[in-house]
């Protein structure tokens, strides 16, 4: 057992109001500079829709994530080791600027300097790439906002698979939801596996995935390798950049900028302990619908005395273990089973999870317009947002976890309404979904009225425990899955046997050391 800690995030889609405050604040802090005008580390999409960049969920087109071979091993969908190298100078599956959008501003100066004329002056769009005027804006990062555009284009959404999507183009069957997206900081990141320069790495202390700007050579294979398309190429610097999970704030115990400024308070941050030795086994699960359950098995119970003892032996600080015990992410993902990972079928084991939305159709259920199931709760399958659509997005097509989450959320509302409004304690609904009174009351506190310290439980980092990285710095290039230690593979492109890392220690003069 190799115990590691990961700072994860849960987003409660049931409360997202689509205000884009998270996107704007992230943009102002991290990507408001030349070369990154088109990049949004955090963006909010309206679903159904093809998203940003266009059709990012279509891995047959973009070749992101992992695939399982017939021998049970996984490899990047982009290709084998040699297949990735062959694309190093000409990658045919990297998104173009038109797949994102051409960033633009407006000629505001013209409004002040325009000569007197018959018509009111207008501010025409101007490209932020070449500075030329644009005839018209044809796409943007939130072009499909509030179901903008015709349904025929939005119907290309991959989450409509195995569904009769034509019926949802009719007005009376229309549905929508918001989906805030950022880098998933996966346990099994495919961007790391496809980087020829070895510039992308995952930090052991908090699981944040970063790009070493000194080692990045701008091959852009990581952009294709990431199934969520959350790595962007800076055309000014010639380097790739991505969401850094605001690690300077995380290290000091503060939440990310998007979480701090979220108007709807939908974001939760917390620590999860996981067994790194089980990652490959979980990601190599044969059936895609089983990937969610296999990923849950990777996480460890922070209250288990044996886990605590082993974690301390392996150098996990005490404050990290205590934070994991109070983690809202662990409660929602593991205890209550409300939060689900985004597209687990990509086999990257993502660590930004989502609580499926229920609010848009709750009033319809209250009005009695839904058929009742055998119990107290209405039939969740008949609600406005199709369960299969949510399942294709959050559980690889398995409707079971989505139904469980939605039923538990509705049961919580039924119980709290009976207690607060009607003045009675009706436990029929929560008994039906397998929850206790204590669990439901805690769920209500976290989902509805959580305080700042409840939503963000982030341990401060221990810089005094950091090792000297001089020996490894800039010394780990393209290897065949063996880290910085040469290669165990029979075939070696660089014609070298396995090499053990040499620890470089500072040589001090004898008189100096006295």
Model regions and ranges:
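Non-ligating segments of multi-cofactor redox enzymes
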Residues: 1-514
